[in-house]
Amino acid sequence: MYSASVTAPVNIATLKYWGKRDKSLNLPTNSSISVTLSQDDLRTLTTASASESFEKDQLWLNGKLESLDTPRTQACLADLRKLRASIEQSPDTPKLSQMKLHIVSENNFPTAAGLASSAAGFAALVSAIAKLYELPQDMSELSKIARKGSGSACRSLFGGFVAWEMGTLPDGQDSKAVEIAPLEHWPSLRAVILVVSDDKKDTPSTTGMQSTVATSDLFAHRIAEVVPQRFEAMKKAILDKDFPKFAELTMKDSNSFHAVCLDSYPPIFYLNDTSKKIIKMVETINQQEVVAAYTFDAGPNAVIYYDEANQDKVLSLLYKHFGHVPGWKTHYTAETPVAGVSRIIQTSIGPGPQETSESLTK
């Protein structure tokens, strides 16, 4: 049996991907930017094994046997096998591309709870099989394969600050992830995640995207005017380590994304009352100067970015209301508990996929 294990990170978009121009290839209607979070707190661990004794491809996720028959997963496996077959010409090279695969995967966070589990999952799957197959392709090339599994997964193939360039080619060959800056560029950036709900969301992302593209009038303006300008401005803010500008663009883009969801017909609600309270709290924190930035993906959970220098200022107010829930690494004075948050995750910026000796197969 041949085996390889990899951990892959969660990434949280600061410039949102929402809308596909090609559903089967997962080609986006706009470019996006994300921050890769530390795998100490959020990661998917995947072990990929190949053996002549395996009768069929199988996947276990968090201990449960899952189907591999989805078109997205099949596209990833086919691309990876094709790349492996191209380096198997020598009679001495094991024909791994012809063997069935067993893939075992575990998250250390709730799956499908708005914490980008599919992104980490497909990034781990592609990275583990690429490692198993000893593929020579770089991460940008592999990101095109991960993209077919889950659009935002392509961004989890890099650490630090990442751009997914939408590309223009119909076959998607130029729709890939690239590094804007490594995690060492801005190591003092921190994130705190407020888990508002561990439940699966009412409107899955793919369904929501299709509805928005088909029915929202605001959407066309967002992808044609708003995002292209913001994309360049946000890259500059990251490279300049300009937190107030980065924060403003991040919050505005979160608002813009949820505005097109609301403008969809029927409207899509991802934020709930707790989410809105958190937005108000961040506005309170930022009254004197901008030191915190909220962003919400397709769900009610909040991610708040801040610089380590302002940690006490940012976390003390959040702790005041949410100090009673688990997950805190630092402690302040808790006064007025606000219901609606089940736990918090304090984290930082992290690297891309990492090879590990930890194996999920015996």
Curated annotation (Swiss-Prot):
Enzyme's top EC category: lyase
Sites where the protein binds (R)-5-diphosphomevalonate: Y17, W18, G19, K20, R72, S150, G151, S152, A153, C154, R155, T206
Record key words, sorted: ATP-binding, Lipid biosynthesis, Lipid metabolism, Lyase, Nucleotide-binding, Steroid biosynthesis, Steroid metabolism, Sterol biosynthesis, Sterol metabolism
Induction description: Expression is high in media supplemented with glucose, moderate in acetate, galactose and low in maltose medium. Expression is higher in the yeast phase than in the hyphal phase of growth as well as higher in the exponential than in the stationary phase. Expression is affected by antifungals. Expression is repressed during biofilm formation.
Pathway linked to the protein: Isoprenoid biosynthesis; isopentenyl diphosphate biosynthesis via mevalonate pathway; isopentenyl diphosphate from (R)-mevalonate: step 3/3
GO cellular component, one term: cytosol
Any GO MF annotation of the entry: ATP binding
This enzyme's EC code(s): 4.1.1.33
Catalytic activity: (R)-5-diphosphomevalonate + ATP = isopentenyl diphosphate + ADP + phosphate + CO2
Classification via InterPro entries: GHMP_kinase_C_sf, Mev_decarb, Mev_diP_decarb, MVD-like_N, Mvd1_C, Ribosomal_Su5_D2-typ_SF, Ribsml_uS5_D2-typ_fold_subgr
Domain of life of the native organism: Eukaryota
Pfam family, one: MVD-like_N
Gene Ontology annotations of biological process type: isopentenyl diphosphate biosynthetic process, mevalonate pathway; sterol biosynthetic process
Subunit structure, interactors included: Homodimer.
Family statement: Belongs to the diphosphomevalonate decarboxylase family.
Protein role: Diphosphomevalonate decarboxylase; part of the second module of ergosterol biosynthesis pathway that includes the middle steps of the pathway. MVD1 converts diphosphomevalonate into isopentenyl diphosphate. The second module is carried out in the vacuole and involves the formation of farnesyl diphosphate, which is also an important intermediate in the biosynthesis of ubiquinone, dolichol, heme and prenylated proteins. Activity by the mevalonate kinase ERG12 first converts mevalonate into 5-phosphomevalonate.
PANTHER family the UniProt entry points to: DIPHOSPHOMEVALONATE DECARBOXYLASE
Official protein name in the record: Diphosphomevalonate decarboxylase
Organism (species): Candida albicans (strain SC5314 / ATCC MYA-2876) (Yeast)
